[in-house]
């Protein structure tokens, strides 16, 4: 595996001599705009592999994306290779319908320490929940970013990531009540502890998430990619583009239903993905918002 090939894949051309917050932010932003958050392997009949060599091959050599366990594993390797002090952490994702956090540790995120300060770095949540900058590990502080205002809160050794969202405008009235729309203005995202993890800690959950009928990842095919002003999402046959804060503290969300023939073109033109096997788009009933 070659760090230069990774940096070329994400389009990062600047110096990486300084292990500072600016460099870390730049690498994160390049990755989230180049590497989609996606689970298309499952819906092409392939496995979502946790091995670093397999992830490198998929993302760097074959120009694909992956889900959190893959893209954040790759980012962990890249940041560590560059010289950042990086730790894997495990997260518990909030379920809006159940009104509780997952019992299983289903999310991989990173902690990076720079000059004695700790930051949360996550390139693998996608959609309008994706951080664009590292979050300083401070409890109760609002941290405004382009997508929203993020807030970390600590209680009894558990940390909670929440977001304060804008209003949203959907010009196509056909989609005003889409099940993909987020209703909450204040949204809980996930919880985590600062206990260091290894990729082996996620192996059983990686299998469960891609095989269980109750998993959102088997229920829906999706692909999400950040842009300089928003985010593209493809869920099943539904394509959306969200423009953050297009006016008056409001996000603009445009919807389009694609035909099967259009999906291949959209994957290539918007997400820069060419699949080797046939995708079977799926929009099941598990809760998933953009």
Swiss-Prot record:
Reaction equation(s) it catalyzes: an arylamine + acetyl-CoA = an N-acetylarylamine + CoA
Function: Participates in the detoxification of a plethora of hydrazine and arylamine drugs. Catalyzes the N- or O-acetylation of various arylamine and heterocyclic amine substrates and is able to bioactivate several known carcinogens.
Active site: 68 (acyl-thioester intermediate), 107, 122
EC top class named in words: transferase
Coiled coil location: none
Similarity comment: Belongs to the arylamine N-acetyltransferase family.
Keywords: Acetylation, Acyltransferase, Cytoplasm, Transferase
InterPro entries for this protein: Arylamine_N-AcTrfase, Arylamine_NAT_domain_sf, Papain-like_cys_pep_sf
N-acetylmethionine modified-residue sites: 1
Enzyme Commission number(s) from the entry: 2.3.1.5
Binding site for CoA: 103-104, 208, 214
GO function terms (MF aspect): arylamine N-acetyltransferase activity
Mutagenesis or variant effect for residue 187 to Q: In allele NAT1*14; a slow acetylator
Natural source organism: Homo sapiens
Stated consequence of mutating residue 149 to I: In allele NAT1*11; catalyzes the N-acetylation of aromatic amines and the O- and N,O-acetylation of their N-hydroxylated metabolites at rates up to 2-fold higher
Name recorded for this polypeptide: Arylamine N-acetyltransferase 1
Binding site for substrate: 106-107
Effect of residue 64 to A/M/Q/K: Reduced enzymatic activity
GO biological process: xenobiotic metabolic process
UniProt miscellaneous comment: NAT1 was historically considered to be monomorphic in nature but reports of allelic variations at the NAT1 locus suggest that it is a polymorphically expressed enzyme.
Gene Ontology CC terms: cytosol
SUPFAM superfamilies registered for this protein in UniProt: Cysteine proteinases
Highest taxon of the lineage: Eukaryota
Pfam (any one): Acetyltransf_2
Cellular compartment(s): Cytoplasm
